[in-house]
Amino acid sequence: MRDGFIKIAAATPDLHVADCEYNAAEIIRQAKQAASKGAKLITFPELCLTGYTCGDLFLQETLLEGALDALSTVCRETAELAAVIVVGLPLRVKGKLYNVAAVVNAGDVLAFVPKTYIPNYSEFYEQRHFVSADTLSGMENVLIKAADGEPCWVPLVTDTIFQCDEQPLFTFGVEICEDLWVPNPPSTALAQMGAHIIVNLSASDEIIGKAGYRRDLVRQQSGRLLCAYLYADAGFGESTQDLVFAGHDLIAENGALLAESKMFEQGIIYADIDLQRLAHERQRMNTFESIEGSEFSFSLEPVENDLADRSFPRTPFVPANKALRDERCEEILTLQATGLATRLRHTHAKTAVVGLSGGLDSTLALIVLVHAFDMLELDRKGILAVTMPCFGTTARTKGNAEKLAEAYGVTLETVDIKAAVDQHFMDIGQSKDDLSVTFENGQARMRTLVLMNLANKTGGMVVGTGDLSELALGWATYNGDHMSMYGVNGSIPKTLVRYLVAYEADRVQGELSDVLRDVLDTPVSPELLPPKDGEISQKTEDLVGPYELHDFFLYYMLRFGYPPRKIYRAARKTFAGVYDDATIKKWLTTFVRRFFTQQFKRSCLPDGPKVGTVTLSPRGDWRMPSDAVSALWLREAENL
């Protein structure tokens, strides 16, 4: 396990009812297959050594002895596997029969875990044969035959988690089938005891509509418990006298379904679980309470995980599904507009002033402004869109700004700031030929000066345009475009800005749609340096790196606390064939360095609405000292 990833597997073997020897052989075969793929935790269905549908054969001594013999065989034949294997069987203890999971590692049974909730309704009549774990007064020791044929004592336990000695985050607890379907599943307490993975051995028969319910149940339980949920279901080979079992195996992590088997097929599913991410989420949520419980430890030799069964979205802020993406875009625009509308109404602002450059961010801010004014049933002429051409402005961006203002029906004002900037440079002794940071920032601050004074003049407020990606990189002029009276894009990363503008372009008609699409095709630029042959010469992504990389870095660093080495590893897998390793490392190092050095700009951000789980507001989700040292992160990034 590296960087907190562990591969787990759920298997549905081809069983023969009451043929323990055959079933053991199938379980061993699948366990070896899963282990060869790198699985460290391999789970089989409920009562898989005998079959779930044995009926009154569970009362037969021959079957109970056969199950224990089969367990001994499984232990012996899997002793060399670097994995934990969980199998189900009936176990008699002091005259009572329990439906248990046997946790097997290195040829030994670490413990038996009994089923708590024994269903006796509809098609289920388990209480005819089994008793609940609640009948136990404490831990019991059970005498069984070990892998070498010698007798050994194994504990029968409840409220227990299993922890790997070499990887402390690799912890799991066990529940069985019906345990999940009740109001207070054992998995709730197991997660609070520290289990990052919940294993469920199940024999859930199939009826119309049940698969969707089961899928949601597993997914939602993993979300509630901030855990991975490994669900192995009985399938082919169980008796079809009255029921059919589909082998519906599922693996979920924190509310997301990672793997699902095909219905009515036996086989194995795999997923790479991010244990560090789960631990980070629990640490972040102070309402996730911990309780005490017992632990059993096991040992596994460390094995490299190739992340073959783990994927990372290339644009984690943007849903891949178009229907969901459109729904999300509508929701985001409504959130932004509602936040702005509320502030406009509270301040009794007569106008709203926005610097409209013809670029992506200011276009989105204008879209939000239009939505907010429409919400308040205000005349759009109260929106003052100001274009402020200077040394780097191109005809394309200026023209698009003018077309946008006209199409949306807002007031357009043009303030050419060249003369004012020239005068300012003369005042401070700045040469116009010195294209330094002063040359660039002087223009940005002059624009903010114009906007602020126009807001005062018209009884309005300045609406900020800067986005989340720019804030993370500090790609904003301090007290220039960094400052406003209300920033509507501060929680929107650049990759999402693009999709929001594209969504608006799809929604509207005619020339406005064409202008929005041209804005989307325009290179991202602050336009603070003179153009070349009338074209934009200063392209942001050439200077600080591709925004799709930076947004990827930003998401996994802030949302889940990934260290640079883990971000790099995920990025290499996700962007293989798009960026080479050296490029990813270069821009990751840039991101880390700039993220730390530019915190001072984020420490005094204007107000603005939160719309996603990753934001950098100093009053909300991200409270970081401006003088924090980046050495630990930067050293790790540079040494990749």
Task: Describe the residue ranges of each PLM region.
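ATP/NTP-dependent adenylation/nucleotidyl-transfer catalytic domains that generate, transfer
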Residues: 23, 168-170, 227, 236-239, ...
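Enzyme catalytic cores with a strong preference for nitrogen-chemistry domains
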Residues: 1-355, 367, 371-380, 412
